[in-house]
Amino acid sequence: QKTYPQNLLNQKFNPDKPNQVWSTDFTYISIGYKKYVYLCAILDLYSRKCIAWKLSHRMDAKLACDTLELALNKRKVEGTLLFHSDQGAQFKAREFRKIIDDNNIMHSFSKPGYPYDNAVTEAFFKYLKHRQINRKKYQNIKLVQLDCFEYIENFYNNYNPHTANLGLTPNQKEENYFNAIK
């Protein structure tokens, strides 16, 4: 029987404070006939906030590493961070593992071929594509970058309410948390 890395998240998508559980994945975006760019995004499951995202012409370990490093530079992680991903080679690569290990992060993996284990991130991509990306045809990565910025930074984090946040946006939920602990 084949063994797989452990799923430590077990579909527990509602941590009780920020920077306890982050999830990540990739999606592709067409920029012409058989041409794609790849978006890697990291969400904080407490608020559903997209805390880091990057685009690249390659879906590789460098994109995963760059996105994780961006998230770590933006956020102050205290205590143990659980980082959940699928079992893609990018997330098992030596250079990615080094960032995980150097930052004492616990890495959790979805079961192979089971997207429900990463449902929050999958839903984020679904709505990004439905509301923004699939409405246009892109010729280059710069145009995708502009629309991703518009959706993620201007709309999603600021104006998109979530039932998991009791109707609050990701930024409102985090603001309420940090104001309450002052």
Q: Which residues fall in each region the model found?
A:
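Basic, flexible linker segments flanking DNA-binding modules
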Residues: 1-18, 114, 169-178
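Short small-residue beta-strand/loop micro-motif enriched in glycine and branched aliphatics
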Residues: 47-53, 107-110, 134-135
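An active-site-proximal beta-strand-loop segment
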Residues: 15-51, 57-58
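Surface/interface recognition patches
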Residues: 56-66, 92-109, 113
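RNase H-like two-metal-ion nuclease catalytic core shared by retroviral integrases
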Residues: 85-87, 93-96, 107-129, 140-147, ...
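Active-site beta-loop-alpha junctions of metal-dependent nucleic acid enzymes
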Residues: 35, 54-77
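Short, surface-exposed connector motifs at secondary-structure boundaries
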Residues: 49, 77-81
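C-terminal domain-tail junction helix/linker
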Residues: 101-105, 129-182
